[in-house]
Amino acid sequence: TLVFQPSKEILEQNFKKLCSYGILDCSIYSASFNSKEISRITFATIGSVKNHPELFTHFKNIIVDECHLVNPKEGMYKDFFDAVKCKVLGLTATPYRLSSSRDFGSMLKFITRTKPHVFSEVIYVNPIRYGLLGEAGLLFNESFRVE
């Protein structure tokens, strides 16, 4: 599995987190880390792999963190996905895109409703429901308890 991260910092954080679970068959392919290792699970930034899709055609799956940043019409991600031809799973906490039309002006569209689209279906949505205002003035969602 190839795992795309939007930045060097998030790549490092997620790589270390996976390793902390005892999964050691993972590597980093990123110019920012001076590391170009490919293993069963490879963490990468699109900028580091965009010119070398042939190295990743054996992967069956790609996971894209912050997938709302993927341009479905053109760009590095689209070119890479077209070249490697495997399943792509996108993860995001922002499943909407701002789009505009001459008739309706600016509007938010769910990521699977844009045309053309990279992501064709939504597997799971966890809506945030805001609850109580905590003592620190922070707004907690219902998964946190204010004591």
Can you say where each PLM-predicted feature lies in the sequence?
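Conserved Walker A/P-loop ATP-binding site and its immediately adjacent core
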Residues: T1-S20, R97
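A short beta-strand-to-loop transition that corresponds to the Sensor-1 phosphate-sensing loop
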Residues: S7, A44-S48, L91-P95
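Hydrophobic positions in the central parallel beta-sheet of the AAA+
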Residues: V3, T42-A44, I62
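Conserved interdomain hinge at the start of the Helicase C-terminal
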Residues: E147
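Post-DEXD/H (motif II) to motif III coupling segment of the RecA-like Helicase ATP-binding lobe
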Residues: K60, H68-L139
